[in-house]
């Protein structure tokens, strides 16, 4: 979960961010 938070916080790839968000949901 911490990794996901860091990835989302960085916002390096908007596409990946959306995918991660979908997985988290």
Swiss-Prot record:
Pathway: Carbohydrate degradation; glycolysis; D-glyceraldehyde 3-phosphate and glycerone phosphate from D-glucose: step 3/4. It is found in: Cytoplasm. Its cofactor is Mg(2+). GO terms for molecular function: 6-phosphofructokinase activity; ATP binding; metal ion binding. Its EC number is 2.7.1.11. It comes from the Bacteria. It catalyses: beta-D-fructose 6-phosphate + ATP = beta-D-fructose 1,6-bisphosphate + ADP + H(+). Keywords: Allosteric enzyme, ATP-binding, Cytoplasm, Glycolysis, Kinase, Magnesium, Metal-binding, Nucleotide-binding, Transferase. Belongs to the phosphofructokinase type A (PFKA) family. ATP-dependent PFK group I subfamily. Prokaryotic clade 'B1' sub-subfamily. Homotetramer. This is ATP-dependent 6-phosphofructokinase 2. It comes from Thermus thermophilus (strain ATCC 27634 / DSM 579 / HB8). The gene is pfkA2.
């Amino acid at each position: 979960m911490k990794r996901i938070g860091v990835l989302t916080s960085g916002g390096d790839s908007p596409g990946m961010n959306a995918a991660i968000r979908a997985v988290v949901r």
